[in-house]
């Protein structure tokens, strides 16, 4: 297991560099209606990036994992065209991010679970959001990249979480063979968070990750068997059974293999 780092909001895989402090679009005069409107718009646009809170970002980094936004930054150095679920003052950061990004001059549809919010779980709204991205990729004939880091269905939503998976499954199967879909498995994925991405064209799994219908704790409680997560759903066992197509050393290596 990798050595855990101290709590930090910095990307654990990023190179150290000096950043000059600046305030974007700073207005030195007395703010008027225009400045207030710009400020409100910027707050709405930035809300998904910060809604998780510093503590949840630190928890993600303590597990030696990147946030979904840091993973997108590895795939492209250009600003992603984020596909928001809705607009308005109530817009918040969903547990699923969908976007169109530019990778070496080519448009790519990408989604990523935000584990810092509801452990990346899925509900009906996110299922519909994911299905729309699949359909968009199929219509535009562009590749699809999935960055999976999800605990599965959002239990408090009841059957709504399962409805979301049903819609996403249907949409993904419709574009199968039409456009390539490359799925990356990050973190600890369970339930629908594990079997939906396996429907993709290729699956990449880094070391120290897991995906399976359930984890070791449930196996212990139901079958009375002790088993490690790596032996149950790690890259070693999945690559031997053919579930995982490509293994990688870590998240960054996996994302570079995508490119």
Residue ranges and their predicted role:
Residues 1-108, 112-119, 248-259:
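Intrinsically disordered, low-complexity segments enriched in small/flexible residues
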Residues 93-97, 128-132, 167-168, 188:
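Short alpha-helical segments and helix-capping/turn motifs at coil-helix boundaries
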Residues 94-98, 107, 142-143, 169, ...:
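Short glycine-rich loop/turn motifs
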Residues 100-114, 129-156:
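A structural preference for short, pocket-lining loop segments at secondary-structure junctions
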Residues 109, 122-126, 147, 164-167:
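Glycine-rich phosphate- or other oxyanion-binding loops that anchor nucleotides, phosphorylated ligands
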Residues 116-125, 157-162:
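Flexible beta-alpha connector loops of hexameric P-loop NTPases
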């Amino acid at each position: 297991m990798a050595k855990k780092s101290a709590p930090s909001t910095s990307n654990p895989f990023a190179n150290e560099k000096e950043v000059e402090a600046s305030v974007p679009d700073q207005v030195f005069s007395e703010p008027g209606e225009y400045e207030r409107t710009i400020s409100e718009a910027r707050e709405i646009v930035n809300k998904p990036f910060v809604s998780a809170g510093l503590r949840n970002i630190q928890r993600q980094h303590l597990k030696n994992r990147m946030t979904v936004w840091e993973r997108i930054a590895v795939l492209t150095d250009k600003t992603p065209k984020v596909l928001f679920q809705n607009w308005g003052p109530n817009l918040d950061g969903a547990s699923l991010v969908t976007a169109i990004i530019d990778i070496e001059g080519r448009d790519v549809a990408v989604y990523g679970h935000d584990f810092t919010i509801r452990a990346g779980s899925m509900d009906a709204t996110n299922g519909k959001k994911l299905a729309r991205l699949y359909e968009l990729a199929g219509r535009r004939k562009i590749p699809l990249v999935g960055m999976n880091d999800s605990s599965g269905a959002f239990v408090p939503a009841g059957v709504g979480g399962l409805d979301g998976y049903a819609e996403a499954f249907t949409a993904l199967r419709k574009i199968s063979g039409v456009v390539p879909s490359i799925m990356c498995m990050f973190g600890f994925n369970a339930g629908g968070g594990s079997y939906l991405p396996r429907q993709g064209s290729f699956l990449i799994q880094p070391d120290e990750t897991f995906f399976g219908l359930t984890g070791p704790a449930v196996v212990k409680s139901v079958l009375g068997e002790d088993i490690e997560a790596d032996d149950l759903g790690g890259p070693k066992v999945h690559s031997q059974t053919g579930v995982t197509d490509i293994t990688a050393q870590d998240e960054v290596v996996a994302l570079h293999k995508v490119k």
